[in-house]
């Protein structure tokens, strides 16, 4: 009998018995959040940095309920939709910045450092990116860039990779289990905004190169492991991806328009087709992503991600 699979994990009869035992103890675990946390803990469903995958587990339990496998307690409140990002003078249009890349001096590209910079990042993206601000789930790092004169130039972020990309997955050559066990080692550049008053040739490719050089160590400092591959999607109706090509990213073709998180090939919400770009962060990235998984890797504590990342290789 095929084990049911939810959110990248197969649930064995023993796993389902654990879920049933937690659900039966309503006095100890009265809410959906408490149930999800306890199931996640008992099944050792962990993120690569050792934290519980509470949200992933909760989503899996909701999917099981929709499929008639279990009944959860009613939600205590309805989730609120995020409101518009409040704007301030900090994100107002600034004087035009022109000239050559050299005129900018050394560029500082670094992760946002505090709540104020995070709020500024959100404002800039909401106000000046053509897609606006979108909430990203899972692991992510946001960056801001300044020139040597303290002028703000750009914003970008990196987040969890797309669930499936046919061209990428063919190139890597991994199977479904390997993809589920190693997908965290692929990171998506999900936002790249050069502020519209900044008109400097070769700035975009320069920033991409700087991001590639520092992201592995920044990501490892935040999440205890370093990615081995970057990906990004560029709207093919708006852009050709010239800056990515100039920065050494490889174009794998176009997406089908399904959306980056369409796990079931439903095509219910068509999206614009995009160029698929990748940038290896390790020369052996394909071997690392195809590395054998320990038996029932989803049930056991995951392997030490440092052993799978280029920061640990000599």
Pin down the residues of each PLM region.
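Extended, charge-enriched "interface" segments that sit outside catalytic cores
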Residues: 35
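Short, basic alpha-helical nucleic acid-contact segments in DNA-binding proteins
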Residues: 56-73
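Basic, amphipathic alpha-helix used for nucleic-acid engagement in HTH/winged-helix/SANT-Myb modules
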Residues: 1-16
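Short, charged low-complexity linker/loop segments at the C-terminal edge of domains
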Residues: 68, 72, 281-294
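Conserved N-terminal entry element of GNAT/NAT acetyltransferase domains
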Residues: 2-4, 20, 74, 81-114
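Short, cationic low-complexity segments
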Residues: 294-314
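Acyl-donor binding region in acyl/amide transferases
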Residues: 13-19, 26, 30, 41-60, ...
